[in-house]
Amino acid sequence: MNDLTLQKARAYEAEHGAAISPAERPAYHLTPYVGWLNDPNGFSYYKGKYHQFYQYNPYDVRWAPMHWGHAVSTDLLHWEYLPCALAPDSPADNGPGCFSGSATEMDDGRQLLMYTSVIAEKQPNGEMRDIQTQSIAIGDGLDYEKPACNPVLTQKDLPEGFSKFDFRDPKIWREADGTYSAVTVCLAEDGSGAAALFQSKDGFDWHFVTVLERCNNQYGKMWECPDFFPLDGKQVLMLGPMEMLPKGEFHNGHNVIAFIGSYDEATHTFTRENVQLMDGGIDFYATQTTLAPDGRRIMTAWLQTWSDTEDKPQGCKWFGQTICPRELHIKDGRILQAPVRELDAVHGKRTFHENVTVQSETALEGIKGRVADLTVTVQSGEYRSFTLKLAADADHYTSLVYDPYTSELTLDRSYAGSRADIVHRRSCKVRSQNGALKLRILLDKNSIEVFANDGEQTMTAWIYTPQSADGITFAADGKAIITAEQFELNL
């Protein structure tokens, strides 16, 4: 690789990334080698390892012209950093950079990356606007070359009336016959998002096939980060609407939603049957899935949202992380999520308390910590609310509060230590079970991931609470009977 822009990024990250100790990072969540991370990209299994690229600015802990960071793992928990994969260094992407995309394997064994290439273009009125096109890069899992044919998709490939300013985030895969398919999002003529399908025989020469789904100003405005995949006999179109209005389980702003339905491969027709929110917490966006060698559909996401990216720990050396990857399944027409089973393999010391009666705030021996896998089951009781406090000390805590009368679960990090005027509290409905509730909670220093009732609902949030705040307590307004099981993690 001879390009100076890429070599500069690689030299910088090698020097400064190595200066960040493991103790300064989460234990099992991917963070940038150095600097800034947002959307996970190119999540794939290639040459015996999981690859996770990511939107990346190595030079600062804030967004800037986008590179692609790169890490690999054999177990989705321990990540090895590889050198920066892409930099904004070609005529197609030398403006704001190499935006989000994906990866697949070619017939000759090379890896094909497809990404949104962005350049600034002067408009007839003199205004400079970013033009979004799709480009490719081909490599061996370490080094990637951008062919001279870039970009491979432009506005001319879109239906009439679709915007060249909002055309991005290709998710690529191979069909059974070897055809390359990719779904992108674009802004339709009505000013709201659409998901468009493109195909290619060789990965270089692409053509428009159809519009799979339209927003019609019903689910936010512009869409981002689409994915399209089969799951348990259904077809799923997953994406991130921007500027959502609150309705039902959806909240204001950025969401991740899944359209679940059927797909006719002969006519390329997707028929929607159900729509659901993928996470009811505070920090969850930019999902992407891959198919594991054993057939599992595994999802990653950015453990962040755009509205709170300015709330950073003072002096931080990195910013942004991805979730613990999740396995997806469909039950009763809805997607269930569970932490990847690889997490079970690192379970260490087990602490177990059974049939504990909880009234006033109570701590249980051995149940504490900031890196743990905790399952709490509220079995029964007469109570008006049940409260679980995490990452707690005299001044800090993040709470989960369950109201059995409304079946509402609330995640609240108002006292986690942030001084920012941002969203700190969200609620979601869980299935009513006469007061019973099961919560699996993943703690990893700066984050909390909650799986309610075996992943029927999830809630995710970052917390920048001092690591010394490691208390966990239980309380009920009334009387609740609980079981708690915690595993330390050997990482």
What feature does the model see in each segment?
Residues 1-169, 174-218, 230-279, 303-353, ...:
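Beta-rich carbohydrate-recognition and catalytic domains
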Residues 229-230, 479:
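Juxtamembrane/interface motifs at transmembrane-helix termini
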Residues 10-15, 257-491:
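Beta-rich accessory regions
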